[in-house]
Amino acid sequence: MIDSSLGLPARKRLLSVWRYGSYLLFLYVMVLKLWYLHSHLHARYIDMNRLDFVIAIGSLMAASFWTLWLSVRGQIIALIVLDVLLTALIYSDLIYYRYFQDFITLPVLLQAGQVGELGDSIKSLLHWTDLRFAADWAVMLIGFPTLKGISRRIALRTVKTSPLSEGLSPSLVPSLSAVRSAAPRMERIENIGPLGQKRSLRFRQRVVRASNGLAVLVLGLGLSIGPIKHYTSSWAQGLLTGNYWSMSLYNVTGLLGFHVYDVYRFAKDHIGGDPLSAEQKQDIQDWFSQAGQSRDVRNASFGAYQGSNVIVIQTEALMNFMIGRKIGGQEVTPNLNKLRESSLYFSNYYHQTGQGRTSDADFSSNASLHPLPSGSVFTRFADHQFDVLPQILKDTGYHAFAFHAYDSSFWNRLAMYQSMGYDQFFSKKDYLIDEPLGWSLGDKSFFKQSLAKLAAEQQPFYSFMITLSSHHPYSLPEKEQTLDVGSFEGTMFGDYLEAVHYVDGAIGELVELMKAQGLWDNTILCIYGDHDNSLTGQADYEKFLGRSLTELDMHKIMNQVPLFIHLPDGKMAGTYTEAEGQLDLAPSLLHLLGISTAAKYMMGSNMFDGNPNHLVVLRTGAFTDSRLHYIPSPDGLFENGTCYSEASGEQVGIEQCRAENTEAQKRLEISDQTVTYDLIKEFEQQNGTP
């Protein structure tokens, strides 16, 4: 209850408390939410120190300064709306990070139409403790009646002391106060008087609000840009121009700054960034030329399987750590274990995906280029030109088909597959959903129907199949849960093991169908995993494997996927332990088919060239060459990364990894420039090739 003896100056001060108190409360609450997000990232070398708090506060001030230009009522409404919007952004980033270990970018938002399709995957990432993000909303709802009552009391006392109320019957005063009940309208009441005085007072109030807002903007920019400049001129030098992980940018700019920079980067790419110089383009061409020459090895395996059909199966979330493993005495992947005996099994094969996940694996495996640091090539640059497996094989007389029992628009596949040269893309509309499972059709029926479609096509063919049944959140109907996962029962890790066991059974049926249809002896069958399972809890892997794990162990587990290549005659079977990656698949298959990639714009190595030390670079900047293994720090500093010996698994001096790191960063930059600037089209036009 405010004392009725308060004069007009006191009530003006009270209005200032409302205006600036609500603004400071907004800053405090939003900083808490940013801190809550940060505390759930658990990223090495990413700490929220004092300067990071300063950046956060400055960014919030720069984003909200304009609310101080409004009336008190308008300001409070604007702050509530801004609170809701920023909370939605922060929480969306947290959910996205739980699955992708990354933040949302603008290219990802352009794929927002796919969110509805994710369904249970998103639900599984929601935690009850996340309700803390809405705690301030609950307080506002509960406290609103009290605040409203206080506002009316303030307005009533203002009316009683205003010139307009002088001489009025006391019974009329409440009516006036009802009309002007809200505290924000006090300014209007206080301004009543001679017209000139009223206008002068309003003008002064607007000048004060404008000045305060601009002062907050200048201060906010100073608090945010100052520390960022300090970082980028010292330990984070070159960060904003390099091809770094989003976490590295976040560590310097803060969350809001990261999103501002992401918008700038997107606009630069699409509205018109700095063009590449002729010298830069020549350097890129020279790199591709040298890489092509190193791949062009004409040994006994070159062309050994010329004219063979090719079936490539990209298996959802199939990771390498389960191959050959048992749980409760039962093999998790019995059919893949059997296939391994007659196939080339690459036990140190790495997925090289980024934010595009499945679409990135598709792109890297078929185009032998790195995915983008932000978004997916499929959705951003589907109209650009690439040297891809389906088109290259079509140029030599093959027919090319893609199979995926899901919506053709997902990941913009229909448009991308047309650009890649596929003769036909069989999507969900082309399948009978007679085995509904997970996202769509179960893999067993998917393989059966896909092979039936292939039987009607001419040979030789290139067939690219994408499975779905082992997709997050790994839910199987009870009748398909045939693996006893023991103590993992009821956990998502246990569900994942069940899902992979089901997919393994589907692969076993595929092999038998190929034999029955006469395809086994004239087809190269390639099976690999597209990416990890997004389950990062180290304790589950240690429990499953029965041993403690190091940082290097976990890095390999989360980045290695199996690769099986079964050749028509079963030759060259065995386990290959050299490090290889998804970029290496296309040039290696072309080598077996006798098609040179010397003049192709590909970045991958030829797995059959006899070199045991191919450099495999991941999108994060991690790399291995079978001798050294480098794990980067999220802060982007080379010196804060860790260099390991592959032979011993022990940490070695960081300088031993410097030369390879320089090459790794160069490759990522060349690939990004090639994709973004559509350089392959430009280079081939210059060379007179179609």
Predicted regions and their residues:
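Juxtamembrane "helix-exit" motif on the non-cytosolic side of transmembrane helices
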Residues: 32-45, 92-97
